[in-house]
Amino acid sequence: LHRELLAQAREGSHRFLRLIDEAVSGQGWEVSYHRDSAEERLKSAKRNGKALFHMYDPYHDNALTYRLVYYMPFWQIEKSAKRWEWDVAQAQFDPSEIDKAEARQFHRFWSQRLFGEAVADVTKEGFVYVPLQGRLLDHRSFQAMSPAEMVLATVEQEPDLPIVLTFHPKETYTADEMTTLDEEICAAYPRVVIGEQDWLTYLAECDYLVTQNSSAALAAMFFRKPSVLFGQIDFHHICGNVYDVGAEEAYRQVKAGGQKFKAYLKWFLQDNTINAGKDDVHQQILD
């Protein structure tokens, strides 16, 4: 664990780590905490026991990793640090198996809890929202193409609507990246603009969203907005997935509509995570 998380774990103030401790201690295991250094992760393979990493790849047979599933109190314990390799990513979503009343209740409660008044006035103002992430010129292994190429593909697949890009607040963009955006994309295609409003405003007002694998696409489901994905991720099931079906089909699926947002959010977050707020959380952890 990193320094702050390690201190919280040892003092018992981190709820999920405390719940893990309680669950495994109840089975007779002794729990110890260590820094998340490369040295300690290597040592974990030689210890007589199991290891649980925070977000790092569990590289040996006796290791797992845990990670927040976007929103508290939803967590996952998995055999891979890559979200698109998680069990839920490989599972099949069948909306007919989800209770409609429970799905509506889940959507109503969590929409308000997570986004408050932002979800009160959802419209379609006739534009595509593209929340950029990092490394705009790189085509990484989990991506169908680079983020810059993704924007150009959107220009091709969406010939009419304005396309609003936003920058990730935690990313730093290079001069080459900015030149590509300004000169090769925005100047060449005036429909493509850099947005300056709050991202929740764009979620509430866009027709649909395009991204590599930003969690904004999951958030968009609370606003009942569909997304085109160019990267692999765990919440891909009701999105237009370019990585799997190609750009033309992915955009066609999104524009066709009919996505079961309420059923999906209940299935993805409630039925396929460890919910730290549930009474049976210790058994969920052990399972």
What is each stretch, according to the model?
Residues 80-125, 239-287:
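Leloir-type glycosyltransferase catalytic cores
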Residues 10-20, 143-157, 177-182:
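Well-ordered, non-membrane alpha-helical segments in soluble/globular domains
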Residues 196-241:
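A donor-sugar binding/catalytic signature common to diverse glycosyltransferases
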Residues 1-110:
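Secretory-pathway glycan-assembly enzymes, especially type II membrane glycosyltransferases
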Residues 152-194:
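Catalytic donor nucleotide-activated moiety binding site of glycosyltransferases and closely related
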